[in-house]
Every structure is written in C-alpha cells, then in structure tokens.
Amino acid sequence: MSGKTLYDKIWDAHVVSEAGGEAILYIDLHLIHEVTTPQAFAGLRAAGRKVRRPDRTLAVADHNIPTEGQALGVDAVADEEARLQLKTLARNVADNGIEFFPMGDIRNGIVHVVGPEQGRTQPGMTIVCGDSHTSTHGAFGALAHGIGTSEVEHVLATQTLRQKKAKNMLVRVDGQLPPGVTGKDVALAVIGEIGTAGGTGYVIEFAGEAIAGLSMEGRMTLCNLTIEGGAKAGLVAPDDKTFAYIQGKPAAPKGAAWDMALSHWKTFFTDEDAVFDRTVVIDGSALVPMVTWGTSPEDVIPVTGNVPDPESFATPDKRAAAHRALDYMGLKAGQPISEARIDRVFIGSCTNSRIEDMRAAAAVVQEAFLHGRLVAPHVKAMVVPGSGLVKEQAEEEGLDAIFKAAGFDWREPGCSMCLAMNPDKLAPQERCASTSNRNFEGRQGRAGRTHLVSPAMAAAAAIAGHLVDVRTLFSETAQ
C-alpha cells in the first residue's frame, strides 16, 4: 500500500462518515463576509436553527466596503444594497455570538488576509468560506476552498460539509527563482502551463525548491490563484516558515498547547512513497515576470514577450476566444506587451495586499523616486492594504509616505478594485495593471481592461506609464 499525500491525510482526519462516493467532512474554520451570508442566516432563522459552532466562525466586512471614509460608519456607505448587506451581517453575527471585525476595526480587512494574520488559519485544518479564493489558506497546509450560499447555511447549521474527494496533483517548481520573480509570477506561469481547466477535479500540492524558498506571503499568493487553474484547492506542506508565521498571532496556541499543536502540525506532509494522479514540473530558475494579455488568467506571457496571434491557437474555440480577447483588450497580435499604455494601477486584493507586497511595491517606487521619477502623469494609481493591521504596519515603516510622495493614492482596507462591487471601479476601456486575481471581462468595471501582475510589476507600470519589466525599469529611466 502506497503512502498518503498531504491532501489524503487532511481528508482522512476530517471524515465523519462516507456513503455513495461522498463524505461528510468536519469543518474546522468557517470564514464569512457580508455578500454570501444573508440568505444563509435567513435560512437558519426560517428553520429555527442556530449556528452550531460560533467559536469556529469568523466574520469580516470586505467585499462591499468603501476604501475611503470608513470612520463615517456603515450609514455613510453610498450604495443601498451594500449598506443593507453590511447591516445585515452585523445583526446576524450579533444574534449568533460570532466574532466579527466590522468596518473601521483595525483588525478588519479582506477575509483571506485576516484569517492568517489572526492565527486562525493553521496546518491540517479544513477551512471554507463563501468566496472562491479561500484556497489562499492552503499555504499553511490547510484544506481550504470556497463554497456556495446553500453550503454556507449547511456549515453554519452543522459544522460539516458533504464532499466528493478530489484527485491529487503535484506541481513541482524546481530551482531557485531569479531576482524579480515572485509567487505571483509562479502562479501565473502554472496557470499558463495547465490552463484554467487543467486543475479541474484535483487538489494541487505545490512543492520543490522554488516553493520552499517562497515566504508565507508568496505561498498565500500562489495558493490564492489555484482556483484560477480550475483546482478545488491548493496546498503547501507546513514547515518552519509556517510555524514561525503563526507563532505569537492572537489565536495561535500558547505555552504547552503550542508544543502539542506543533507536534500535530508536523505530521502533515506527503509521504515519500505517495502516488499522485498527475505531476507537473516547472523550471523555476527559467521564469521571468509574467503578465496577462487577455481575458482569462491562462492568457499569460512573459513581460518580455509579444501578444500572441489568435491563429496560432490549436482549436477553433481557442482561436475565437483569442480574437475576442484581443478585441476587448484593445491589443494587436504581435505587439510587445510592454507597449501597452496603462491608465490605472491597483495594488491590493486577497492575492497581493500583505505587508510583503506593500514593501515590494514601495521599494520600486522609492528607487524610481531616487531616479527622479513619479507616477506617470496620465496614470491614477492606488494602494489598498489588505487589513487595518497591514495598513498600520506599513505606516509605521513609512511605506505610505513613499507611495503618497510619488503620487499613489493610499487607501483604507477592503477588496476594492479587485471586483466591481464597491466604489473602486475602472471606467470603460480603462487599462489597469492589477495585482488581483481575475482579468475577466468587466471584472474591475464595465468594459475595463485588466492585466494581472505582481506588486513590483504594478508599481513599475505606474512609474513607466505602460507595462514594463521591473528588472529593466531603471535602465529605461536612465535613458
């Protein structure tokens, strides 16, 4: 009998019962927000049920909140539906004794930033949330994935979820990443390799020298984008970096409980003789900064590359999709992607809004400032920290001053321009270099054009006024 993968071990540890090819899984942590919970709580009330484990539930306000004027409170939120959702969440969590970080609380922020920084995300856990990018928490060796509104109600009522086990995929990224290449670039390269449907039916475990070299923030970015490759979830086995990140966090175990937890967490790894259903190997040492050109995360090329010719795609459907994407994006086949002039820059989202992301972007901006460069005159650039605590730390380090001096708008935490559900939106045909996770048509605003990049690449684009290789920005500046 072969050994078990990390996914196998977490799954087996949480099976309550199995029948008909499905299992009832126990859920360790349920993260909730204002958008996907109103109907779920209404269903509980209609059935006369209460939340089964409020202590294993954490609520934040993130999707709909404005990133300016949060001190004015929920009543000042302009959008009526958003205001109602925020008030409804506050009432529902109060009625059920659920811990809640409301808008304006320094602990509030994007749910997938808040969970880890509070120490609620831990190795070996099962974690769900009514949000696609719950896969972020897989960076800690937790089985984490998004669920629908009806499933949100089921978890609230039972602390369990009916699931069919996925297959195992290993993505091994060998070698050391070159300077300028980040977890975001690895994630985009993986999606470019397997496609947006390549992970369908799988849970992906990321391993290899390049993955071991990533910080926890980099691993969170990588796992965050797993869903864009079609996978159920993404995982990185916990190691000393993981344990160091968790230690001392508000909800982390303390004293003897820490020692016990650490011993338990160290059991979550893939056995040497475990067999994966599929293995993908990528040479991390050959990667360069990546950028999307189309309207799907798989439409990705090196920043040094040219926009592909739609006729080069293998199938009629792919060719038609590429033609449509180029028309929507206002690009031409064969043009260097670095010639794409941008109008907006967004640094934020659950993909790239942590303190490391702020530092990486600020380092580029500060270097540009020393070369006499500011945000290009035609570009509107904004930085949105992922939580109040990230914002506070960035300000303690002076990062906000660096951004503001160069012409960036420094905002309050929230999902912001990742999705057009709050005041931060693109105007039609505006082109944005964005650190978010989806470049679908209209994702950042009706007819808006999105290019996914890393924080350093986004900062470089803001300075240059067009997509640019951050590694050569300063040679361009010197010309």
Swiss-Prot record:
InterPro entries: 3-IsopropMal_deHydase_lsu, Acnase/IPM_dHydase_lsu_aba_1/3, Acoase/IPM_deHydtase_lsu_aba, Aconitase_4Fe-4S_BS, Aconitase_4Fe-4S_dom, IPM_dehydratase_rel_enz, IPMI_cat
Pathway: Amino-acid biosynthesis; L-leucine biosynthesis; L-leucine from 3-methyl-2-oxobutanoate: step 2/4
Annotated cofactor note: Binds 1 [4Fe-4S] cluster per subunit.
One Pfam entry name: Aconitase
EC number: 4.2.1.33
Role played: Catalyzes the isomerization between 2-isopropylmalate and 3-isopropylmalate, via the formation of 2-isopropylmaleate.
Designated name of the protein: 3-isopropylmalate dehydratase large subunit
Gene: leuC
